[in-house]
Amino acid sequence: MSAARILSRCVWPSTLLLSAAAFAAAPTPLQEAATGLPGARSLYMELHQSPELSAHEVQTAAKLAGRLRALGYTVTEQVGGTGIVAILQNGAGPVVMLRTELDALPVEEKTGLAFASKVRVRNDAGEEVAVAHACGHDLHMAALVTTAEVMAHTRGTWHGTLMLVGQPAEETISGASAMLKDGLLTRFARPDVVLALHVGNGLPAGQVGVVSGLYNTNADSLRITIYGKGGHGSAPHTAIDPIVIAARTILALQTIASREVKPGEFVVITVGTVRAGTKNNIIPDEAVLGLTVRTQTT
């Protein structure tokens, strides 16, 4: 699927806040959206090639802030770290908030695309990692900026306040709370409506999926540290092997969903990282598991 086709289904419906009498105005928001698609595609590719890790989205935030200021938005940077808030006031009316993520993931891109990410950085633990936009946040940002352009260019068709939020550190589940603690809902306009989207491959290009009721899940991140007793790999009877315990724990965790949760209730438990040991003939003192848990109820 081409970047242009993907973007065509992800630019926010720009008919938000439209008054019925304004439909005769030219150009219409949808016409503006079509005009802005080439620029959206270009921005998407630019962002895709320059991803930044969670809480380090300095250049990404600056790029979005600059574009939004150029459109006439009042922009505040460094909200909750590297977050941004952009406001466009257009008379009396509801406050509508649109939100995008800013961060990328510590994964290596192997798509072979001409605009594939080749970025490598050191993470907070000092490890060198590849970085890529593997969760669509680059596309979400391009959609947000294009929507900002459409709404700024068609002010005669709507009334109210548009509030755009660039959320940092979404992947580490810390950016939203940081922005709230920094006064997102008290320093700025309090939204009447909050809208967000997520790109996916579950629908054909050109279609937008809308779900009534609950859709996405709550995400919790857990770390389990298993303490053992190190020793030589040739004498496991003198040690307490945390790797063996970790292996048993990983398998046991999967029985929570199948045996502890009521059938029909949604839960996913995934062990995404296993860290232990430094050499193949040494039993380490500990093993660390990194988990994500997804639920729809508390």
Task: Name these PLM-found stretches.
Residues 120-132, 138-139, 151-285:
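Histidine/acidic-residue-rich, glycine-tolerant segments that coordinate divalent metal ions
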Residues 9-21:
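Bacterial N-terminal signal peptides
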Residues 103-105, 229, 296-297:
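Short coil/turn motifs at secondary-structure junctions
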